[in-house]
Amino acid sequence: MLKKEYLKNPYLVLFAMIILAYVFSVLCRFYWIWWASEFNEYFFNNQLMIISNDGYAFAEGARDMIAGFHQPNDLSYYGSSLSTLTYWLYKITPFSFESIILYMSTFLSSLVVIPIILLANEYKRPLMGFVAALLASVANSYYNRTMSGYYDTDMLVIVLPMFILFFMVRMILKKDFFSLIALPLFIGIYLWWYPSSYTLNVALIGLFLIYTLIFHRKEKIFYIAVILSSLTLSNIAWFYQSAIIVILFALFALEQKRLNFMIIGILGSATLIFLILSGGVDPILYQLKFYIFRNDESANLTQGFMYFNVNQTIQEVENVDFSEFMRRISGSEIVFLFSLFGFVWLLRKHKSMIMALPILVLGFLALKGGLRFTIYSVPVMALGFGFLLSEFKAILVKKYSQLTSNVCIVFATILTLAPVFIHIYNYKAPTVFSQNEASLLNQLKNIANREDYVVTWWDYGYPVRYYSDVKTLVDGGKHLGKDNFFPSFALSKDEQAAANMARLSVEYTEKSFYAPQNDILKSDILQAMMKDYNQSNVDLFLASLSKPDFKIDTPKTRDIYLYMPARMSLIFSTVASFSFINLDTGVLDKPFTFSTAYPLDVKNGEIYLSNGVVLSDDFRSFKIGDNVVSVNSIVEINSIKQGEYKITPIDDKAQFYIFYLKDSAIPYAQFILMDKTMFNSAYVQMFFLGNYDKNLFDLVINSRDAKVFKLKI
């Protein structure tokens, strides 16, 4: 009897659904923990390392907050939202720092089930919410960006807008004071957590205003909700925002009759004018330029040089095909189609769900802006599928028993989740760095000072700063080609040029932090160098850096290290592109070749490589299509650490070299095809061959995974 009473209590049923969905989401994310724990190379400091490159930026910020300080201009994320939350969790919980950053996403991202279930409950459809929560919490795109070890702001980047959507729908349906104050609260939290959400928040508030004008134009509480929400978009300090919002909320709650539509109109107009004057549209324009129109601001800033745009090389902002798009959102194409149909049906039944359109549309921008956006559509489409399944059950109940209907729904849910389970099983993401790489960088921390710089590619900027506690020129947050030009140049040009550019770029970068806002150092460091060295032709200036008699007039203020990891060989052609571009035209008109490969097959005296090259078994030539190309030399590398290699000359007039790596830390880089330009690059000569000028560099860390050189000039 007591059991039946519990089952009849809607709040207990709702609570049980939330707990079950949350536990389900967490357990699914623990699969990666179980799998990764089998590999010792994924551990550092007795804990699994994280799998998110950007996560190291927030980890560095949290580490510095725990220490209580950081170096000026070190690009630390000190005080950022995720770093701050991590700091407080470290202070109030008994867990280690490494454990906190590993598991935060596991537990926080699973909170998405709460607003989904609560939202469906507003429509008196608990089954819709429960099924949607199960699907949304582990759908491919959402799982990939919130799995265990994915330490990033993505862990709440969908949770918070779903709470905003829930309170908007609740406001429409109930018109209650709780929703009125909760709505701006969650918008404010979302903006603090993820400042790039500004555009989405504007879209949500704008649509809410339009909805109000169409369906509730005579109800004052909706206009007050728009005003309070809009105030969170302002650039004033949060405590001023909070004070104004609380005062206006209290005035409305206590003096509704005196706040007539004229006063509300004046308040609304004043709020709008204030937002425009405070630069409220600037964040929207930036997001559109970078992700949709793919513009690189560096060309505008420099008014001269046209650099390579880094967002063209990031997988997250590449366009995706429609099948992949559907799978990422709903786990499979068929579930996506059912979800889309269900969402349209849901809109027809409950017009307030139109408030979900900005979130859904942002996810659909993945077709143009890249796969990273698909995560936004996941919960909205899941609600559509949940609604469809709840309607299907209603039809079944009319024809069959309750038991039969429940069995059918359970079976359909399992079938829906099956592709997602397969994806979770197959998606075995490695940690950002291996244990050896992390240990090497931790060793560098004991060699370098906090004010010293490490010159390396931007992919490694955040981890290098976290493990070595140094400064870097670039990192995952620098998306302008003008920043990445310098490390690209230092790694892909000859040693002399690399040494000179490393010193110049670091010293000029430091000077730029203290330059006036209108100084050329703020807009383009390369142009500032040319100005100081009385050079007007960029090609001549860059060529002069290769000359031994080039004199650096800039005073040396700190030590500089070059970090050259083995893994960079997989992307070195991309790395080099940033400095081989024609700075006058923005066109990559200086062709070069650097291509890693592994053997696929051997037949008829030929070795078929993974990059499409067919290599003769005597290594004297290779074929690309029908073209046969001679090889200059074969370089057999027996030990990268010891610098043991053998060069076999073949044709001194040929332009290409074949590297055969017998000692490789990268499993998919057994062969490297490169031309003379790349062969003479600092990365190839110093890392693979161990050839470096002792007057320019000292080798301070040496392994087959990575080498670190200290600049002596």
Swiss-Prot record:
InterPro entries: Oligo_trans_STT3 (IPR003674), STT3-PglB_core (IPR048999), STT3_N (IPR048307), STT3_PglB_C (IPR041563). A motif (MI motif) lies at residues 568-575. GO terms for biological process: protein N-linked glycosylation. It is found in: Cell inner membrane. A motif (TIXE motif) lies at residues 313-316. It comes from the Bacteria. This is Undecaprenyl-diphosphooligosaccharide--protein glycotransferase. It comes from Campylobacter jejuni (strain RM1221).
